[in-house]
């Protein structure tokens, strides 16, 4: 009896080794980290001969999908996509080093502070003028135009003599549109559409056996589910859109890259 029990436990232990190595350890608390660009090529794109000045308004780059976070147990009002996607766009533009990005998200606060500075200088008779705000020659607009759940799902498994193993997966997709608009003419200079897959994978093993003359039941389960972060997938899609915008703008001679 002991031997049979030992064999059952040994099989489930060995089968669990099929799970990805990074899943073998239980998750632990980690320190906060400073996020880097997901698309490394964006940081290596090079410098523009003359950096274009661009602006991103919060209302000009938002989630247009209205997609709710999936839940099979109860209704949820949480959205599947962040309601501040413009933050990722601003970050991608800024960290690429290719553009001058002007502040438009907190424009009201910026204007108020400038008014306070002017008022203070007038009261203390300081006539030094305040530098004018930098205006943008280009507007970066667009949105998250699509989020589709369960685009593809499937899996496989096997069971023999009460010992089983299975793997399941599911794919969602997020679609991002990015436009580059000339402020002077209102003309759309560039338009990019990017689709990113979001993958979820579940792996499990189990043992279901009767021991001790079929009077005692042994049941062991082991498994792990990994869901790709929607925010990281969205960040990757937006960074890819910015990278493609830089490449297409260069091909159309809207800007040039140093040391070419």
Label each PLM-derived region with a short phrase.
Residues 18-52, 148, 155-157, 168-260:
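C-terminal/domain-edge helix-coil "capping" segments
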Residues 52-150, 173-191:
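N-terminal segment of the mature soluble domain
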Residues 127-128, 162-166:
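Extracellular loop and loop/strand-boundary signature of outer-membrane beta-barrel proteins
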């Amino acid at each position: 009896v002991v031997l049979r029990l030992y064999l059952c436990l040994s099989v489930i232990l060995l089968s669990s080794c099929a799970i990805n190595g990074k899943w073998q350890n239980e998750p632990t608390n980690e320190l906060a980290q400073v996020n880097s660009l997901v698309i490394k090529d964006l940081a290596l794109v090079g410098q523009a001969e003359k950096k274009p000045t661009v602006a991103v308004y919060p209302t000009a780059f938002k989630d247009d999908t209205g997609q709710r976070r999936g839940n099979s147990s109860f209704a949820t009002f949480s959205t599947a996509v962040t309601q501040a996607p413009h933050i990722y766009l601003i970050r991608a533009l800024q960290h690429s080093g290719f553009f001058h990005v002007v502040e438009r998200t907190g424009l009201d606060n910026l204007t108020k502070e400038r008014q306070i500075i002017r008022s203070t200088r007038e009261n203390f008779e300081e006539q030094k003028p305040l530098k004018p705000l930098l205006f943008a020659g280009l507007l970066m607009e667009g949105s998250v135009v699509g989020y589709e759940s369960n685009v593809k799902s499937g899996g496989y498994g096997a069971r023999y003599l009460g010992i089983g193993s299975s793997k399941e997966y599911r794919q969602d997709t997020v679609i991002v549109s990015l436009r580059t608009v000339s402020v002077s003419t209102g003309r759309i200079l560039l338009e990019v559409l990017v689709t990113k897959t979001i993958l979820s994978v579940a792996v499990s093993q189990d043992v279901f056996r009767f021991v001790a003359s079929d009077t005692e039941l042994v049941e062991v389960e082991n498994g792990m589910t990994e869901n790709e972060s929607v925010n990281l997938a969205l960040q990757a899609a937006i960074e890819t859109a910015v990278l493609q915008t830089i490449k297409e703008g260069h091909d159309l001679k809207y800007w040039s890259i140093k040391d070419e």
